Amino acid sequence: MDYFTLFGLPASYHIDTQALSLRFQDLQRQYHPDKFANGTQAQHLAAVQQSATINQAWQTLRHPLTRAEYLLSLHGFDLASEQHTVRDTAFLMEQLTLREELDDIEQTKDDARLESFIKRVQKMFDTRLQQMVTQLDNAAWGEAADTVRKLRFLDKLRSSADQLEEKLLDF
């Protein structure tokens, strides 16, 4: 059973996150291992496994990027285990330049420049995310997979910038 079916949702990028949360809570209560503590070892083990599946499905579907990756996996694009990389050299060069800029910001400890950098990277991420949503809506699975690969780069860059911001604020 796929994660969307588990939560009673359509296999789509656009999901009702409130319904997802409510269904998660219901499933948690229904399959919590403690409810099977007095049952057989097999029942307890089955509850533990089901609970783990529910938690994994919840974590996957609640985050936009992992939800997109999972949806793509249902259409034959298993991005989680693939070794395929981004082949767009212009994008890769841009990422290299951005990484160098972030390193320079770290060396100079320039808060204002970091704030501007974070906003710029967030805008780039949001633009790509909207592009991916359009591609998913149009069932352009291959194009969406390429965009997700690029979003991963931007997400890691965004995370690195946020970590640097925390580091600079600690001073």
UniProtKB/Swiss-Prot annotation:
UniProt name for this protein: Co-chaperone protein HscB
GO terms, molecular function: ATPase activator activity; protein-folding chaperone binding
Cross-referenced Gene3D superfamilies: DnaJ domain, HscB, C-terminal domain
SUPFAM superfamilies, per database record: Chaperone J-domain, HSC20 (HSCB), C-terminal oligomerisation domain
Quaternary structure and interacting proteins, as annotated: Interacts with HscA and stimulates its ATPase activity. Interacts with IscU.
Keywords attached to this entry: Chaperone
Signal peptide: none
GO CC terms of this entry: iron-sulfur cluster transfer complex
Any one GO BP annotation for this protein: [2Fe-2S] cluster assembly
The organism of origin for this protein: Salmonella arizonae (strain ATCC BAA-731 / CDC346-86 / RSK2980)
Pfam families with a match to the protein in the record: HSCB_C (PF07743)
Domain J: 2-74
InterPro entries: DnaJ_domain (IPR001623), HscB (IPR004640), HscB_C_sf (IPR036386), HscB_oligo_C (IPR009073), J_dom_sf (IPR036869)
Role description: Co-chaperone involved in the maturation of iron-sulfur cluster-containing proteins. Seems to help targeting proteins to be folded toward HscA.
NCBIfam families the UniProt entry points to: hscB, PRK05014.1
Family statement: Belongs to the HscB family.
